[in-house]
UniProtKB/Swiss-Prot annotation:
GO terms for molecular function: melanocortin receptor binding; neuropeptide hormone activity. It comes from Bos taurus. Its main location: secreted. This is Agouti-signaling protein. Transmembrane segments: none annotated.
Length: 133
């Protein structure tokens, strides 16, 4: 009995370590020192060298002026025209917003509203979800 419990405990501990090791992120896994040295030396050689060029005051002013000229047209946008949408007239027998609208009832009066049912279609009401419709 004790041997089987010891075997089960050992198996459980091994499974815990196995699951913990398999869920480690790739960068957290232990690496070889040789792999680290090879990767770091290759990465440095892959990138081209960078040359630093000093700008004089005149070129700075020109580039600043060019940037301001580019910004000005982008800021001036044509204002959005609010086009009044003509809504269709509501149907003659209709249900007002927030009133009960069970399926045999007529449609909602507001064209942007729809009949929303809850609790297995026991409580239905006309609702407007998009006020800018």
């Amino acid at each position: 009995m004790d041997v089987s419990r010891l075997l089960l405990a050992t198996l459980l501990v091994c499974l815990c370590f196995l699951t913990a090791y398999s869920h480690l992120a790739p960068e957290e896994k232990p690496r070889d020192e040789r792999n680290l040295k090879n990767n770091s030396s290759m990465n440095l050689l892959d990138f081209p060298s960078v040359s630093i060029v000093a700008l004089n005051k005149k070129s700075k002013k020109i580039s600043r002026n060019e940037a301001e000229k580019k910004k000005r047209p982008s800021k001036r946008k044509a204002p959005m025209k609010n086009v009044a949408r003509t809504r269709p007239p509501p149907p003659t027998p209709c249900v007002a917003t927030r009133d009960s609208c069970k399926p045999p009832a007529p449609a909602c009066c507001d064209p942007c509203a729809f009949c929303q049912c809850r609790f297995f279609r026991s409580a239905c009401s006309c609702r407007v979800l998009n006020p800018t419709c």
